[in-house]
Amino acid sequence: LVIFGDSLTDTGRLKERLKIFPLAPYWIGRFSNGPVWPEYLFMVTGLGVQNHAYGGASAADPEALPGENFYGRARHVGQFFVSGTIGLQISDYLERTLKDGKIERGDTTAFLIWAGANDYISKEPLRGTITTFLNSPEGEAGYKAVVERAVTQLGQHVRSLYAAGARRLVMMNLPDLGRTPIVLQNTTYVPEHLESNDTARRLELARRLSELTRYHNQRLATAVEKLRAELPGSEIILVDVYEYFERLYGIGGNPLLQPEDFGYDLAALAVTLSFEEQQLTLQRRCYDGSYDQGTPDPDIVCPNPDQALFWDSVHPTALTHCWNAYKVGNDLAEAGWIRPLPDQRTYRGWCQTIVKRVTLGSAEDTVSAP
């Protein structure tokens, strides 16, 4: 499995390049408090994994939005030079890793791309940009144009890999950005009809981010269908991360499965926003610090990091990464590409053992795959 992606997949490559962040209590350069999903997938399946992901990478090349100020443009350009794009990761792989830029075992190697979130959340710190971006989705500075550009580029990345010989390809959609702790942390977004009530502002931000996520996922699904028809001999899997995160939240899916069945204690970090007839329950982040803060202060880490859903404002915990690996692995197994994974109860016990060992300093020396 050859992977291209961003901080949701980065296994320490950005920190290896910068030698700076993320600092502890981030785990060995990961944007989480423990291993990230490709590492769990390797442990549970024995599948060979080659990971090219860099934290901060975007799906498309940075492009200034109309009306964006100098600070916003400089921020996007800076992020591009530090983290690059998925296209640069693929070009580097084709030029430096392969002989003559050709994939020799395209039928026994899968190529996975997971990106897009940075194309959108990079706008969040910028007050004017994020407001126009979300409030005017149809406008030239609105999110629909950015989604179209990101999804178009993701399709081009698949075509590049196919042209080099890849035949088994995996795309992943996005979890609901409107349910991440970034909604609780944000101070920059201003609704169209300004409310003095900050709760109403956050509810509107959550709604807009959820709309953006659904639009991205719909456009990506359409793009994947077109690619399947366009690329003869290809097998393309679309992993529905959005639906899977809904299950982890206890929304939809199997009504007999609740978050605690996955090992979560969501009540501990739950925050319910209520305004007039609107209500939404979100999860607070477990770690209240920043990438470059680095502190041994236990007070800024939640008391149950092994049972939390989100580590920081946008990144999942080690436990959530473990379940994301289970989702990806099961989709690969259903396609007949790898052997079946263990049943959910067995896998849960394995996940919890590893996560507790990493996050709580368990004394166990080894953890065998289930």
Language-model features: where?
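Conserved active-site regions of diverse hydrolases
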Residues: L1-P370
